[in-house]
């Protein structure tokens, strides 16, 4: 179990990265799976229709973020077909193809996500 201070720092890192995220998918290792939050989760749902975002509630911080969870097997298949910019044992950063950025903004405004 992580100390409370570390959990707060991790959530702050996620929020800081996601606030104006228009071109990346940030993935975080959580136990035996990976998670994408907020704009990263929306990017995943746009690029890969098999992913579904859900509202993840952080009661201690009174915040709700969109979230997509991926198994290790899913992440292996996903990474084969994407451009991983940064990969570490507990985090990944994936660039969104330039040609998809404008399509994403249109999709997002159409579906209100």
Language-model segments: residues:
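Basic, polar low-complexity surface loops/patches
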Residues: 2-113
